[in-house]
Amino acid sequence: MPRRGPVPKRDVLPDPIYGSKLVTKLINKTMVDGKKSLAEKICYRAFDIIREKTGRDPLEVFEEAMKNVMPVLEVRPRRVGGANYQVPVEVRPERRQSLAIRWIVNYARERNGRSMEEKLAAEIMDAANGVGGAVKKKEDTHKMAEANKAFAHYRW
């Protein structure tokens, strides 16, 4: 913890093509080894694939996917009298967004074959339709929170 007060939050700039901060965050999460231009290419090509396959605005599809993947609850471990309890807590809005993007990119990477653009496009389209690995991860997170509802009074 810093002694000189809170650390200021750095704001990301909206991306040049879609003018969305959400897309910039997706690009940053897709980036590996600081290769941002490659990450941008991957994301924009994925969005082109989404436009081709759905005939809808890719930003709209991506926002729909985000809505379907963002978790409302998660569990956090809390040590009480020598036992670790999984305590369900509400997820802050910024964390919801970052978790959703992280899950979409990670599950896109885990998909078989093809190029990263196609895998990312497929994962975003699946998430927008309420299926796919990222949506399953959200449902599992909610199930864990539901199963541990009894420990909700240990919240801090």
Swiss-Prot record:
Lineage, top-rank taxon, reads Bacteria
Q: Which gene encodes it?
A: rpsG
* UniProtKB keywords: Ribonucleoprotein, Ribosomal protein, RNA-binding, rRNA-binding, tRNA-binding
- Alphabetized HAMAP family for the sequence: Ribosomal_uS7_B
GO cellular component, as recorded: small ribosomal subunit
Q: What is this protein called?
A: Small ribosomal subunit protein uS7
Supply the CDD domains for this chain. uS7_Bacteria
Single GO MF annotation: structural constituent of ribosome
What the entry lists under NCBIfam families is as follows: rpsG_bact
Provide the family line.
Belongs to the universal ribosomal protein uS7 family.
Q: InterPro entries, alphabetically? A: Ribosomal_uS7, Ribosomal_uS7_bac/org-type, Ribosomal_uS7_CS, Ribosomal_uS7_dom, Ribosomal_uS7_dom_sf
Starting at the broadest rank, the lineage of the source organism is: Bacteria, Bacillati, Bacillota, Clostridia, Thermoanaerobacterales
Complex and partners = Part of the 30S ribosomal subunit. Contacts proteins S9 and S11.
* Any one GO BP annotation for this protein: translation
- Any idea what job this protein has? One of the primary rRNA binding proteins, it binds directly to 16S rRNA where it nucleates assembly of the head domain of the 30S subunit. Is located at the subunit interface close to the decoding center, probably blocks exit of the E-site tRNA.
